Amino acid sequence: MSVWAIGDLQGCYDITQRLLEKINFDPAQDTLWFCGDLVNRGGQSLETLRLVHSLRAHSVVVLGNHDLSLLAIGARSEEEQRKVNPDLLRIVLAEDRDALLDWLRMQKLAHVDRALGWMMIHAGLAPKWTTQMAEKHAREVEQQLQGGGYRKLLRNMYGDQPGWSPGLIGYDRSRAIINLFTRMRYCTPRGRIATDDKGTPGTQAQGLYPWFEVPGRVERDLKIVCGHWSALGLTITQGVHAIDTGAVWGGKLTALQLDTDELRVVQVPGREVTGPAPVARAPRRPRERLGRQRSRGNRGNAGNTAVPAKPPVDTPQD
């Protein structure tokens, strides 16, 4: 029996099949851990979602930001749904859409196997969260997603604010938890996420750190595998194993074997793309008062905890 973690699929069905062939995946014996972002941008999101759904008895999935956006789209009106990009539109118009979306909504934000010694998340953890705290906060949001009021949560999850604080309540609390688990790359030592910084370490604004290198972070008792940050590439450091290697951007799709003493990495080439992958911005001037309310002339009400306007229906928050 083997346990494999697999990076962001993002609708790359053919590439996913090639990777499963390369690791000799045997559903009778093996288990797959999918790090989230199953859909969007790859052109075969419906096929990819159906594939992972068909493997549900032999796999574990954590939700990524693109998966949550798909759920939000599925909960909207038919008129709004028809405005999404063609890749996601095929899912919301599919005959089996309800089965697929209902199953996706039941997936986790964090998966823990203490016997194996691993935790899987999509993006990141707050600097002060132990693995036990992370599990607890993940369950809070999972219960909302899996309950009867999930549509309200999906309508209220968009926005960069507020930053995490243990005293948050309501949708502010849920939004902060979702952002940490599904959108995090860089943050301050206090855990304020910087959603505009997406490049490789060294390109971020002053005072920001990769979430797994923040000064003062807690020591964690499990190894962590995650995806989300394609610009980072395959990175193993500080007990964190980041395996989103940009398959959808022409990079590679990565599988990491978790049940061996020596980590085994298997990769296949990603999607052929006609244009360049997104490039990181050059380092910028230090931000002042990061995470606090900005002046009225800047980017709307960035410091207001009220729910911002929704982004376009086909634009997941990265």
Curated annotation (Swiss-Prot):
Keywords: Hydrolase. One of its GO terms (molecular function) is bis(5'-nucleosyl)-tetraphosphatase (symmetrical) activity. Residues 309-318 have a biased composition (Pro residues). Its EC number is 3.6.1.41. This is Bis(5'-nucleosyl)-tetraphosphatase, symmetrical. Residues 282-297 have a biased composition (Basic residues). It comes from the Bacteria. It catalyses: P(1),P(4)-bis(5'-adenosyl) tetraphosphate + H2O = 2 ADP + 2 H(+). Coiled coil: none annotated. Hydrolyzes diadenosine 5',5'''-P1,P4-tetraphosphate to yield ADP. Pfam families: Metallophos. The lineage of its organism: Bacteria, Pseudomonadati, Pseudomonadota, Gammaproteobacteria, Lysobacterales. Belongs to the Ap4A hydrolase family. It comes from Xanthomonas oryzae pv. oryzae (strain PXO99A). Residues 269-318 are annotated as: Disordered. InterPro entries: ApaH (IPR004617), Calcineurin-like_PHP_ApaH (IPR004843), Metallo-depent_PP-like (IPR029052), Ser/Thr-sp_prot-phosphatase (IPR006186). Gene3D superfamilies: 3.60.21.10. SUPFAM superfamilies: Metallo-dependent phosphatases.
